[in-house]
Swiss-Prot record:
Species of provenance: Xenopus laevis (African clawed frog)
Designated gene of the protein: cycs-b
Protein name per the record: Cytochrome c, somatic B
Location, primary (coarse class): mitochondrion
Function of the protein: Electron carrier protein. The oxidized form of the cytochrome c heme group can accept an electron from the heme group of the cytochrome c1 subunit of cytochrome reductase. Cytochrome c then transfers this electron to the cytochrome oxidase complex, the final protein carrier in the mitochondrial electron-transport chain.
GO cellular component terms, semicolon-separated: mitochondrial intermembrane space
Length: 105
């Protein structure tokens, strides 16, 4: 598993413009990520998802996020997430470690 401290820096640099992680965080361009792990795609309450996200039907976990974050548009064709992805596996692992910690405490 990755380093949550490094993952926080990656989140701030690459994700925080569109996402929040706090329990009471608001949706931005992207959904609030609180409760992400164990939730199906397209299910954050109050966020308007594309049909592609709603119908993907996978459950977010370490493995699914590892694949998704490498190339979101390849993993969920039709997603409105405008993000090229993170090619370095160790950076994705760090980000996932941070998300796992910050979206459930």
């Amino acid at each position: 598993m990755g380093d949550a401290g490094k993952g926080k820096k990656i989140f701030i640099q690459k994700c925080a413009q569109c996402h929040t992680v706090e329990k009471t965080g608001k949706h931005k361009t992207g959904p609030n990520l609180w409760g992400l792990f164990g939730r199906k795609t397209g299910q954050a309450p109050g966020f308007s998802y594309t049909d592609a996200n709603k119908s993907k039907g996978i459950v977010w976990g370490e493995e699914t996020l590892l694949e998704y974050l490498e190339n979101p548009k390849k993993y969920i064709p039709g997603t409105k997430m405008i993000f090229a992805g993170i090619k370095k596996k160790n950076e994705r692992l760090d980000l996932i470690a941070y998300l796992k910690k910050s979206t459930s405490e």
